[in-house]
Amino acid sequence: LTADVDFRFYVGIHHPRMAWPLTLRGFRVCVSANVLRDRLGDVPFLGCDAPWFLDSGAFTQVALKGRFEQSTDDYAATIRRFAGTGLIAASTQDYMCEPVALRATGLTLRRHQALTIARFDAIRAAGTAGVHLLPVLQGRTPDDYRRHLEGYGARIGYGAWVGVGSLCKRQGDPGVIAAILDAILLD
């Protein structure tokens, strides 16, 4: 990994009320769309004027239910709803590639990658009110991630801010994660 790569880390929280104490201390937070979807009003949490990130809640929906309960249009509306706060980016509704997710859908890894790109395109077409829609790369091996990056084509430019999915639940050798990042950082 090169020293000039800008890695951004966000503290994932499962309840909006946990955000404010963290933002007061200078931490950036990542809040799931699953917990914000039914909130009333346009204020996701106290302290939302600080930069924060919206996670699509994909793992809960896909791994536990085998599909997305929230349409791409509804998710784009959620992004637009909070665009006037400190929301700086939202992840696409990606189909992760952990074995549990593949079993839940009954689909192949390559199909999950194609569905992730299709949902990215649909959310972007629905509009995000200027909030960056983060493309997410999915796979299991370095070649999988590289192929997914290539599948996005011109949608992802050089030096783009992207998410790298299906890493957080891995156990074992951290060198595997380094190999994945090396494979996609070539471009």
Region roles according to the model:
Residues 1-124, 128:
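Non-catalytic, usually N-terminal nucleic-acid engagement modules in DNA/RNA processing proteins
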Residues 107, 111-116, 127-129, 142-157:
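Core catalytic architecture of nucleotide-activated donor-dependent transferases building glycoconjugates
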Residues 134-187:
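Glycine-rich phosphate/ribose-binding loops and adjacent secondary-structure elements
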